[in-house]
UniProtKB/Swiss-Prot annotation:
Known role: Symporter that cotransports neutral amino acids and sodium ions from the extracellular to the intracellular side of the cell membrane. The transport is pH-sensitive, Li(+)-intolerant, electrogenic, driven by the Na(+) electrochemical gradient and cotransports of neutral amino acids and sodium ions with a stoichiometry of 1:1. May function in the transport of amino acids at the blood-brain barrier. May function in the transport of amino acids in the supply of maternal nutrients to the fetus through the placenta.
Protein name according to UniProt: Sodium-coupled neutral amino acid symporter 2
Encoding gene (name): Slc38a2
Organism, scientific name: Mus musculus (Mouse)
Binding site residues for Na(+): 82, 383
Reported regulation of activity: Inhibited by N-methyl-D-glucamine. Inhibited by choline. Allosteric regulation of sodium ions binding by pH.
Membrane-spanning ranges: 77-96, 103-123, 159-177, 189-209, 218-238, 290-310, 327-347, 369-389, 411-431, 434-454, 470-492
Domain comment quoted from the record: The extracellular C-terminal domain controls the voltage dependence for amino acid transports activity.
Length: 504
């Protein structure tokens, strides 16, 4: 069968992907996290590897000979798990504290199942549509509008991820410096100001790495991120059995040691009972409950990485890739559940939007937590340049796809992206707002709306009245409801907070 015929080869729903997926000439990997840096076009300028493919995909530049996948099943599971896990895990205890244990587990189960279903839709659409690139599926389905929707959603998600990483630097680096230098009085010290430190880290470390034309070895830092999060989970579980309940006692002790015995600490110490403080709640509804679904969707986004991982899978087939996805999603489901549960059962109603920061408020300085902070800081700092790379390339090929590489343009785009992200981190009040907004918008698009919309448009052999198409349509509508509903409630919460702040 000729290569030109492969894109029109339709596999049956029951086939494993047969000759089509095993003989695809889809040789381009979308660079997301670790997969981003394993391009098959080593001889092509990295900035010319088209992250946002144009309509001229037939050019020889993107045609290579067929290559079989070389990544083992186990390593594919690791890569996909690595693509799923991220900074969102730090906000899950906050989500549980504002939904209750039972409601959180229900929401976590539904979001994980829906995310897995969208992977199924995406894989089937890729086979039927003849592309292993997310943006190109959008272009084939809806032309320029579809391509821009996919590219815009991926870019927003990446900017959200970058912002959350820099928020971690803003929250945690001052605490690390304070602990290492044994500083108690933090008034007026610029090097303990999170905003200054974010700018300094961005200028001294992140910007030089981001200006590289080929990030190469930094691709392995995404694996470091997964290991750091596993270490973080182990520490969260251990600390549950070391921190007393109610945590008010530890909070007051910490406040007393630091010489800042605040009115809030006094109120917590004397106006709550141990029974109330240490009793888990199973269903909670308050103004912060609305952030639960966006935080969960933000935590499960991995879909731009699914197709390149599928392409690299040894003996690749759709069924085999779905098995990879099921194992990865189940592993992350357990990891997220344990992190959220033990974080919540440690602090109950005192959980902050970034769990690691909660420990410093309640426990104070701790060697084990200091090691966790250092590991997480190193991981997120080295991951930011990896995330910038596909954003910059998408912008470059959107604005000037035919121009030769220019260091000036390369530098301006990089500085602009990093500056914009720094402004978000400095002026957005909390990481919760990043999780909420990106989770309700870009993550909802990538999980719910785009895979189902592409499936409905590109899978021609199934009529609209078929069970599969009706299911995809319902999935699409549910995604629209989730996005509009979550965004609306989040905006209302922002307005309420602004009004309350103005009233004082």
């Amino acid at each position: 069968m000729k290569k030109t015929e492969m894109g029109r080869f339709n596999i049956s729903p029951d086939e494993d992907s047969s000759s089509y997926s095993s003989n695809s000439d889809f040789n381009y990997s979308y660079p997301t996290k670790q997969a981003a840096l394993k391009s098959h076009y080593a001889d092509v300028d990295p900035e010319n590897q088209n992250f946002l493919l144009e309509s001229n995909l037939g050019k020889k530049k993107y045609e290579t000979d067929f290559h079989p996948g070389t990544t083992s099943f186990g390593m594919s599971v690791f890569n996909l798990s690595n693509a799923i896990v991220g900074s969102g895990i730090l906000g899950l205890s906050y989500a549980m504290a504002n939904t209750g244990i039972a409601l959180f587990i229900i929401l976590l189960t539904f979001v994980s199942i829906f995310s897995l279903y969208s992977v199924h839709l995406l894989l089937k659409t890729a086979n039927e549509g003849g592309s292993l690139l997310y943006e190109q599926l959008g272009h084939k389905a809806y032309g320029l509008a579809g391509k821009l929707a996919a590219s815009g959603s991926i870019t927003m998600q990446n900017i959200g991820a970058m912002s959350s990483y820099l928020f971690i630097v803003k929250y945690e680096l001052p605490l690390v410096i304070k602990a290492l230098m044994n500083i108690e009085d933090t008034n007026g010290l610029w090097y303990l100001n999170g905003d200054y430190l974010v700018l300094l880290v961005s200028l001294v470390l992140i910007l030089p790495l981001s200006l590289l034309r080929n990030l190469g070895y930094l691709g392995y830092t995404s694996g470091l991120s997964l290991l750091c999060m596993i270490f973080f989970l182990i520490v969260v579980i251990c600390k549950k059995f070391q921190i007393p309940c109610p945590v008010e006692a530890a909070l007051v002790a910490n406040e007393t040691v630091n010489g800042t015995f605040t009115q809030a600490a006094l109120a917590l110490a004397f106006n709550s009972t141990a029974d109330d403080a240490c009793r888990p709640r199973y269903f909670i509804f308050n103004s912060q409950t609305v952030y639960a679904v966006p935080i969960l969707t933000f935590s499960f986004v991995c879909h731009p990485a699914v197709l390149p991982i599928y392409e690299e899978l040894k003996s690749r087939s759709r069924r085999r890739m779905m098995n990879v996805s099921k194992i990865s999603f189940f592993a992350m489901f357990l990891m997220y559940l344990l992190a959220a549960l033990f974080g919540y059962l440690t602090f109950y109603g005192h959980v902050e939007s970034e769990l690691l920061h909660t420990y410093s408020e309640i426990v104070g300085t701790d060697i084990l937590l200091l090691v966790v902070r250092l590991a997480v800081l190193v991981a997120v700092t080295l991951t930011v340049p990896v995330v910038i790379f596909p954003i910059r390339s998408s912008v470059t090929h959107l604005l000037c796809p035919t121009k030769e590489f220019s260091w000036l343009r390369h530098s301006i785009i990089t500085v602009t992206i990093l500056s914009f992200t720094n402004l978000l981190v400095i002026f957005v009040p909390t990481i919760r707002d990043i999780f909420g907004f990106i989770g309700a918008s870009a993550a909802a698009m990538l999980i719910f709306i785009l895979p189902s919309a592409f499936y409905i448009k590109l899978v021609k052999k199934e009529p609209m009245r078929s069970v599969q198409k009706i299911g995809a349509l319902c999935f699409l509508l549910s995604g629209i409801v989730v996005m509009i509903g979550s965004m609306g409630l989040i905006v209302l919460d922002w307005v309420h907070d602004a009004s309350a702040a103005g009233g004082h």
